[in-house]
């Protein structure tokens, strides 16, 4: 299971109802923060999430409404007692930006591991301490370059699901019971001249959980295959109606209907709209424009929580 907490759902500048762009994923007690706009810490405090267990911060791009809360978050994480390394993932130039922002937080009690503009999937395993970058992990993060006014990337977060234990296969291979547990968790066993592998005791692959996060971009075609069959597609809806399509094109953002079209073409399960323009006081009033195209469309609210479970 993975919990999705919307910390900030506004774009451009905060409003009385909405902090700026931020999202928190909780997987087995380890947390991933996606963007940290103004108000992120306050939302986390109100939601009582804690700060120490944030293992990864993913930045979509370096406009202020997505990153201005970054130095404060780093400082608070340090004050919470964290000493394990913290991974930062971001677009081209994120290393330079992080170095600039951390001038005001120079004495952090933990190491920053920066991954700039990753070109391949990143694999993480849950350990006793944190999410650790290593091959064969149960959590995958991959990115897609978007079309915005500065380098910007989308994210997929995929939780792999382990195949079921197949007792019949284990018996047919005459595998000693004492090795069944180790084989289930992926270990190979050498015993009395034979090699036992996990495939000898496991069934078919099972569908995991996929969450896609796309914001601050025009609706480019590459997004469709990137979000394909996502369980949750979180997408910007800076403008409510297509009356503002010229503004959307000029500023490289999207309308509700454009986001819904991507959701429909990507065959996702549900669309959650976020990153609402400052003039859109009640985004729910425009939800019909999205639902005409994609029925399972919803509007995010600050501190709204969604939980996704395996089918």
UniProtKB/Swiss-Prot annotation:
One annotated GO molecular function: zinc ion binding
Entry's EC annotation: 3.1.26.11
Manner of cofactor binding, per the entry note: Binds 2 Zn(2+) ions.
CDD domains named in the record: RNaseZ_ZiPD-like_MBL-fold
Co-factor requirement: Zn(2+)
InterPro entries registered for this protein in UniProt: Metallo-B-lactamas, RibonucZ/Hydroxyglut_hydro, RNase_Z/BN
Keyword Oxidoreductase carried by entry: no
The reaction(s) this protein catalyses: Endonucleolytic cleavage of RNA, removing extra 3' nucleotides from tRNA precursor, generating 3' termini of tRNAs. A 3'-hydroxy group is left at the tRNA terminus and a 5'-phosphoryl group is left at the trailer molecule
Similarity annotation: Belongs to the RNase Z family.
Cited HAMAP family: RNase_Z_BN
Assembly information from the UniProt record: Homodimer.
Name under which the protein is recorded: Ribonuclease Z
């Amino acid at each position: 299971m993975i919990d999705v907490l919307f910390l900030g759902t506004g774009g451009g500048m905060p409003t009385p109802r909405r902090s700026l762009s931020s999202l928190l994923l909780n997987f087995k007690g380890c947390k991933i923060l996606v963007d940290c706009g103004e108000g992120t810490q306050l939302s986390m405090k109100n939601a009582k999430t804690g700060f120490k267990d944030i293992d990864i911060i993913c930045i979509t791009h370096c406009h202020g409404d997505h990153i201005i809360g970054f130095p404060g978050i780093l400082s608070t994480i340090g004050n919470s007692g964290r000493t394990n390394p913290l991974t930062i993932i971001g677009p081209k130039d994120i290393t330079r930006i992080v170095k600039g922002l951390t001038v005001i937080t120079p004495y952090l009690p933990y190491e920053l591991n920066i991954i700039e503009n990753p070109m391949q999937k990143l694999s993480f395993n849950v350990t006793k301490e944190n999410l650790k970058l290593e091959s064969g992990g149960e959590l995958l993060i991959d990115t897609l370059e978007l079309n915005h006014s500065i380098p910007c990337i989308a994210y997929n977060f995929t939780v792999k699901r382990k195949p079921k234990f197949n007792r019949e296969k284990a018996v047919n291979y005459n595998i000693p019971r004492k090795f069944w547990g180790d084989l289930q968790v992926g270990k190979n066993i050498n015993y009395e001249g034979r090699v036992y592998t996990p495939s000898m005791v496991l069934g078919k692959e099972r569908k995991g959980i996929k969450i896609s996060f796309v914001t601050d971009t025009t609706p480019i075609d590459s997004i469709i295959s990137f979000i394909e069959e996502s369980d949750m597609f979180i997408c910007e809806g800076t403008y409510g109606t297509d009356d503002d399509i010229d503004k959307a094109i000029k500023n490289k953002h999207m309308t509700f209907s454009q986001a819904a079209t991507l959701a429909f073409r990507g065959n996702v399960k549900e669309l959650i709209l976020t990153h609402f323009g400052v003039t859109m006081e009640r985004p729910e009033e425009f939800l019909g424009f999205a639902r005409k195209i994609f029925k399972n469309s919803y509007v995010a609210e600050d501190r709204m929580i969604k939980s996704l479970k395996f089918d």
